Each structure stands twice: as structure tokens, then as C-alpha cells.
Amino acid sequence: MDKRDLEQLLSNVADGSVAPADALTRIQTAPTADLGFAQLDLSRGVRQGAGEVIYGAGKTAEQIAAIIEALRDAGQEHVLVTRLDADKAARTAELLAGNIDLGYVPNAQLALVGGMPSPTGNGRIVVACAGTSDLPVAEEAALTAEFYGNEVDRLYDVGVAGLHRLLAHAEELAQAQVVIAIAGMEGALASVIGGLVSCPVIAVPTSVGYGASFGGVAALLAMLNSCASGVSVVNIDNGFGAAYQASLINHLSAGAPCAR
């Protein structure tokens, strides 16, 4: 159960569609569920505002399906699965068929249960990537941000090799609440954007590039050493982590505790 699930449950109690005793039973669900191969954190959504996310790499389709079912049984209506390849997604969907609908986005390797919510953020998140080869990471970031209730503008293939492509979107950048800047090779895009905007920039180095890019390490070090003051950096290819952080920022209220 996450914050939006809890709000909906309380709303249902208020309008009489759910009995208070039934609501209490759902809220008092044990904070963990032991599946043998996984210990699910069922209270994370109440503590942090967003429920547990499933990292699909390294898990079997059977394990992923079992986790999804357990999360749903505990009241978490929306579930996100990252790093899920197409074959495993198809098998997971078969296991859930007739019970839970699994939406899959191949180019982002993301699976969604419960669909996309209406936007609730303070402003817009811009996801900008340097090249078409960065699109899988960019789409992971963009879809994750939308999953957490944010409006997203996509600026793709706007790398520094053709700076005019980025500058053509100066208005969108100026209106952003947060920018996620994604680039491989030398990773210069984040610093350039950081020098153009007044909002936080979250840089994502990607593993795109030739030999001396060292699988994204060159871009990572360049972004960490950015001279633009508002740039922070997440791990290589971590579009999900960047989007989660951007969503937290976009849902902050002045003087309010951090909550989504």
C-alpha cells in the first residue's frame, strides 16, 4: 500500500463504500511478507510515499509474478517492475493472466500493473538525452516519473554534438521543475543544461560509447566533476533512480516534510 492507495482507502471509508473495520484490517497488514525467496516490505509505501519496486534482472518470471500478487493482495494497486526482458515479461504475463493485467514497454524494459496515475506534481520534469542510443535509459526515466504522478517532457537526441538542437528547447528547459540529463560518451550534456536552468539537474551517465568510455565510467566522472552547481549524479544507466529522485523533488511543498 502506498500513499495514493491509503488516500483512496480513507476516501472509500468516508463515502461509505468500505467499512471502517475492513479498512483497519488492510492498514494493519503485517509490515513484511515472507515468500521464502523474498521478504516484501509492505509498509514502505506508507513510510516513504511509494511502494516497493521490483527489480526484474536476476529474478525468474515465477518469482516476479508471486511478488506482484503478494503486493496486490496487501493493497498496493500500482506495481512497477524494472529491468525486465521481453521473454520474462511474456512469461510473467502468462502466470498472471486472468487475475492481473501486466503492461510491458519493451524499449524501457519496464512492466506496469495498475496503469499510470493522474499527475500530482508541482511542475514538469524534463527528460533530456544526448543520443538515440540513450533512449532505453531515457524511457526508463520518463515512464518511471510518469508512474509516480509527474508530467514529463521528452527532449531526445539533443546532445552537444549539435548544440542548436538543445537550444531550440530553451523554453521547455526554463519551465522545468527538475531536469534529468542522460548521456554517454563524454557526458557533457548535463553540464551544459546545468548552466542554462535554475532548477535541479539529475545527471545519468550511460554505458554508451567506444572503448575509452569504459562502459559509462568516463561520463560518470565527467558528470561528477561538473562545474555547473546544480548537477547531481546517479549511477550508470540508472534511469529509475534519477526519476524517483526527480519525483520526490517535484512533489515537495515549501515548509512541508518530504512526501510524495
Across the structure, where does each feature detected by a protein language model lie?
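Long amphipathic alpha-helical segments
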Residues: M1-D85, A89-L95
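Glycine-rich oxoanion-binding loops at beta->alpha junctions
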Residues: A108-G114, E151-E172, V217-A218, V234
